[in-house]
Amino acid sequence: RVAVQETDLYVQALKPLEDITRELILKHRGYIEKYIKTHPEFLDALEPWRDRGPAPVIICDMVSAGQKAGVGPMAAVAGAIAEHVGADLLKYTVEVVVENGGDIFLKTDNPVTMGIVAGTSSLSMRMGRCIKSKEKPVGVCTSSGTVGHSLSLGKADAICVVSDSCSLADAAATSIGNRLKSK
């Protein structure tokens, strides 16, 4: 587990990567923080962000995910950090799992069954999905209006989305969750 400010990553790999993970968190958070300093409205945007010219890749991924899902770019921030840190960690290991507040970047040689935490719902940890990520990394992201501290405009206990893009999975889970107004 490696924590830097609001970013709290659980990393599982074939060897210890804590120091490298900390450096990567600082690198990718730095890109986001610097962009927010020059575009402060980015932080609170709840609508898709219009392209404002050149930006770091992590920002471009967040913007693209938000545009595709119909949400603001920060709806993709946890998935984007998990994805970019995870992709960089693959330079040091062939398998890695990076979890960031329910958003997971996964690259493993063997299938993994993931349970879905849905708070006090009777379905919590009673459902799972077998994820295969041998050929390419996969993003598995969960959004909730009843569990955790992230902003959700809906009431879903858990919305789980699987995608090639962890950023897009995060934004899509948020978007779907925002639409569910009653249980």
Locate the predicted segments by residue.
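A structural signal for small-residue-enriched, beta-sheet-centric alpha/beta enzyme cores
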Residues: 1-16, 49, 115-117, 121-183
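Short glycine-rich, polar/acidic loop-and-turn segments at beta strand-coil junctions
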Residues: 13-15, 36, 102
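Alpha/propeptide regions of enzymes that mature by internal proteolysis
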Residues: 18-98, 162-183
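Glycine-rich anion/phosphate-binding loop at the beta-strand->alpha-helix junction
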Residues: 67-148, 152, 162
